């Protein structure tokens, strides 16, 4: 499958993180994943995409700030649920720290934000978005139909990855034109920061692109630190070597010295967002 195949999350205590993602969020061990030879990686099925937990040991968030969406890079990962309040109560009882309690949000959805044990920012969201601008009526209707069929008790399933970028046109040229992710719609939050969210279908999940008219801060990601939290995005491509050449022409940079990941190739987009190109399957 092309599109977003997984998100990589760094853990300081792998057993604790496995308890969180498996026992609390309900994700299952994934078998037959051929993208990583290392023993530090544990793969979990999270619905339409995977979670890759990496045992980092001693490390930190590398300057990433969960409370500053003006910081370019990966901002959060979102899970679709049947009922945000129901899931939030369960998570709160387990001691999970919420950064935003359940609330109604722009787009007529309900959401909440919380942190994993190492500070990765996660979201639960229910319902379906009512876009201010719709580019694909078919994809928007698919979301509406899925929400109508989702049981109230449905637990978390991979829904989206959110990123903050500097230039929307450049980002669309990369993800839409070079990678083929289809535009779904937009929500214009406005406000003093000029906040706009653009949604692209990236395989079975969605890429949420945050842009602001307010000044942004640089992406603090670097490849050579034991980073905890949100470490990268795996994208499925037919041929990783060909994809790197094609994406380089669209503005990506291959990370020098990367040893590969069972056929995957590591690169960054124009905002420094780390992407691992892996064989689509």
Enumerate the predicted regions with their spans:
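Core segments of cupin and vicinal oxygen chelate
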Residues: 2, 8-51, 56-57, 163-206, ...
């Amino acid at each position: 499958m092309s599109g977003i195949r997984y998100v990589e999350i760094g853990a300081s205590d792998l057993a604790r993180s496995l308890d969180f993602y498996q026992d609390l969020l309900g994700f299952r061990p994934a078998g037959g994943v051929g993208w990583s030879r290392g023993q530090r990686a544990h793969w979990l099925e999270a619905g339409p995409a995977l979670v890759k937990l990496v045992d980092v040991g001693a490390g930190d968030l590398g300057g990433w700030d969960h409370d500053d969406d003006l910081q370019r890079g990966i901002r959060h990962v979102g899970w679709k649920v049947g009922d945000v309040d129901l899931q939030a109560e369960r998570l709160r009882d387990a001691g999970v720290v919420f950064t935003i309690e359940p609330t109604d949000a722009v787009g007529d959805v309900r959401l909440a934000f919380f942190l994993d044990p190492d500070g990765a920012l996660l979201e639960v969201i229910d319902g379906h978005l009512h876009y201010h601008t719709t580019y694909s009526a078919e994809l928007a209707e698919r979301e509406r139909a899925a929400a109508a069929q989702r049981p109230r008790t449905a637990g978390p399933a991979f829904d989206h990855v959110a990123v903050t970028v500097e230039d929307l046109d450049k980002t669309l040229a990369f993800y839409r034109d070079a990678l083929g992710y289809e535009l779904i719609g937009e929500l214009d939050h406005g406000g003093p920061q000029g906040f706009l969210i653009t949604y692209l279908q990236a395989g079975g999940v969605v890429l949420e692109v945050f842009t602001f008219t307010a000044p942004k801060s640089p992406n603090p990601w670097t490849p050579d630190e034991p980073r905890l939290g949100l470490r990268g995005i795996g994208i499925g491509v037919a041929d990783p070597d060909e994809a790197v050449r094609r994406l380089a022409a669209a503005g990506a940079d291959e990370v020098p010295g990367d040893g590969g990941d069972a056929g995957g190739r590591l690169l960054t987009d124009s905002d420094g967002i780390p992407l691992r190109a892996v064989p689509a399957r």
